[in-house]
């Protein structure tokens, strides 16, 4: 290919004739599932999405049992509701590290990415909602000479 190009004109014609890589392609495994990883704080979630009845399983438990607080359940369902796909996909997630809030955010991030891998047309909706963006906020480290990350020790004049 490269050896046959002798001038700039030929390079221009070759560039026009070459097809661009397809952007919207499903990424599925052998069982027809879309796989993605989501992260938030110290939590890492591995998420599989496949067509089904809307069952969501987190660490081999129903998500209502694993995330008992309604706020965490709502966080988990946000990408599904935003894309109008409630009850259409079965979701299996394994999550480790961090606390419950970070884990819920990690699963949400993983669900969003897996939905875009399964159905690439949802990317614009989920991107607009901010579900595909990794939340990079992590705990600030403690500094020496300080009680915590920013809090100073109590000051005494005398």
Swiss-Prot record:
Q: Which keywords annotate this record? A: Ribonucleoprotein, Ribosomal protein
A biological-process GO annotation: translation
Which InterPro entries does its entry note?
Ribosomal_Su5_D2-typ_SF (IPR020568), Ribosomal_uS9 (IPR000754), Ribosomal_uS9_bac/plastid (IPR023035), Ribosomal_uS9_CS (IPR020574), Ribsml_uS5_D2-typ_fold_subgr (IPR014721)
- Mind listing the GO molecular function terms for this protein? RNA binding; structural constituent of ribosome
Q: Which GO terms describe its cellular component?
A: cytosolic small ribosomal subunit
Please name the Pfam families in this protein's record.
Ribosomal_S9 (PF00380)
Q: Which family does it belong to?
A: Belongs to the universal ribosomal protein uS9 family.
User: Could you tell me what this protein is called?
Assistant: Small ribosomal subunit protein uS9
């Amino acid at each position: 290919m490269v050896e046959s190009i002798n001038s700039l004109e030929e390079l221009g014609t070759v560039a026009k004739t070459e097809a661009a890589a397809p952007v919207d392609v499903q990424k599925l495994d052998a069982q027809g599932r879309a796989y993605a990883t989501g992260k938030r704080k110290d939590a890492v979630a591995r998420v599989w999405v496949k067509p089904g009845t809307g069952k969501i399983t987190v660490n081999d438990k129903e998500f209502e049992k694993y995330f008992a607080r309604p706020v965490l359940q709502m966080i988990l369902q946000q990408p599904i509701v935003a894309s109008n796909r409630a009850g259409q996909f079965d979701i299996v997630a394994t999550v480790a590290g961090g606390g419950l809030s970070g884990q819920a955010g990690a699963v949400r991030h993983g669900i969003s990415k897996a939905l875009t891998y399964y159905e690439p047309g949802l990317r614009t909706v989920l991107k607009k909602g901010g579900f595909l963006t990794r939340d990079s906020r992590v705990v600030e480290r403690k500094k020496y000479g300080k009680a915590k990350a920013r809090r100073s020790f109590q000051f005494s004049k005398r």
